[in-house]
Amino acid sequence: MFTSNADERISPASLTKLMTALLIVDSYNVGDFIEINFPEEYVYEGKVAYLETGQQMTVESLLEFILIYSANDACIAASMIVSGDVNEFINLMNNKAVMLGMNNTNFNNPDGLDADNHFTSLNDLLILSKEVLKNIELLTIIMKPSFISDIEGNDKVYLNTNKLIEKNYLGLKTGWTNEAGLTFIGVNQSNNRDILTIVNKSTVNDNKDNHFSDTEILYTVSIDTFKNNILLEINEDVYIIRNGITTSTIKNNESWIVFGNRYTENKISLDAVDENKIELNANESSHDIKIPKSINKKIWKFKFTKFLYFNANQNT
């Protein structure tokens, strides 16, 4: 609906952790038990949960530390569990990015800390987000306001870094580094819509919440500006087929709806459709109507699921 600098190279910060999580569920089930392990030279850096080598937990618990609490050490542990080596895991991340079509992305770590040659773009983050949204196990974790873990010996509550979760933003991930600024991928399911927003380089204010304010502004503008536009009501005449004996009117059996700008007229006049814009074939049950331009200069293509054929030919 709205984009700005969507192909510009940016630092992904902890949004990187979404790719890390995808690779974990590619290799393990969430109920599997794993043992934490770190490289010998590993030093805790940034936000960490102080996981220790030898600790045992489920994959789900590890994903909670990665996606909810955003712990960097949990990402390093994940890379060791999946690949046995951090650099090999990074190769898997980049291979997965290529497979998904994230052509303006290169990962150089699994946690998102600023690093040379560690970059992505908003469009690539959109691709990554859509892939995460397909995984119900990851979404179930991402949507939790908090989780409890006893890795420190006693039960401790770890809060979700997503401060909009109580406002129906189920996620997907927050981030913050010096290069990325404040960044957030939000998915809001209010008003019978699923709207995904991605903000990057929000100014780091004292409360470190400008990315949430920017997200709410984007969401509000999208709700105010866009809607489902009804192009044809149900049972409205679509096309008339005539020959020397019979005149048959084709009606649509469902409304034709296009999501678009509520301030732009989207109604299409079908009386301009001619024979080279509608295909009739007696041996096929589905046909395309292609209307080159609507009033707002957009190209629409409509696909019939059922199309009646009455003693007509392509020259009629």
Where would I find each of the regions flagged by the language model?
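Domain-terminus/edge residues, biased toward the C-terminal soluble/receptor-binding domains
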Residues: 102-103, 117-119, 123-316
